[in-house]
Amino acid sequence: MILLLLALISATTAFQGDVVNLTLNEQATVTLDECMYFLDTLQNSSTLPPGEYGIKITHSCLGNEQIEIRTNTTTDVITIKVEKDPNPEESLVEAENEVLSLRKEVQRLEGEVSYYKKLFEVLNKINVDLYDKLQNLATENDELKRELELYKSKAGNYSQLIDELRLELSKMNETVRQLQATNEDLQANLTKIDAELSRASANLELFQTLFFVTLSFLVGSAFALMRR
């Protein structure tokens, strides 16, 4: 292993198809030769935080290949000597197996993509329906607010009308009380007048009796004088 200021590389000599590990001691931008790529990102250039990263050396690599490690302050270069694959048949079988595995993974991912597309369409439709419902609810809410304001206005008018009616009723009650008092006074006066009328009737009868008695006496006296 070679100790560098920025990174450690697990091997400086490798065969085609091998994987070497790069350990970064600090964040850096790492650029690989085009015949190599990072196992995690499948790219040959990435800005990476400190950590260990696997680098795949493809069969297109041969000879001295370079890895550039760059930070804001410094740049280092690691050279890896890539030798020809000693067992190309095994590598071919491994590559075929890897391709088959990748195809299966692609099919699985395509299935997931198809599922998520359908799920997205369903969720999007639900979202559209919910949006429409929200719009309808917002419209209904605005209408209810307008109706509420109208009812509040009517309630205010009704409250004013009720106050006016209560005032009018109070005046009418006062008038009724005054009329009742007047009626009571009239009833008292009628009672007095009735009593006076009863006394006057009794006196009239008495005077009528006295009148007829006096008249009878005078008539009798007149006949008596005429006989003499």
From Swiss-Prot:
Span of the signal peptide: 1-16
Principal subcellular localization: membrane
Organism from which the protein derives: Archaeoglobus fulgidus (strain ATCC 49558 / DSM 4304 / JCM 9628 / NBRC 100126 / VC-16)
Assigned protein family: To A.fulgidus AF_1225.
Topology versus the membrane: Single-pass membrane protein
Lineage of the organism: Archaea, Methanobacteriati, Methanobacteriota, Archaeoglobi, Archaeoglobales
The UniProt record lists the keyword Lipoprotein: no
Transmembrane segments: 206-225
Identification of the protein by name: Uncharacterized protein AF_0540
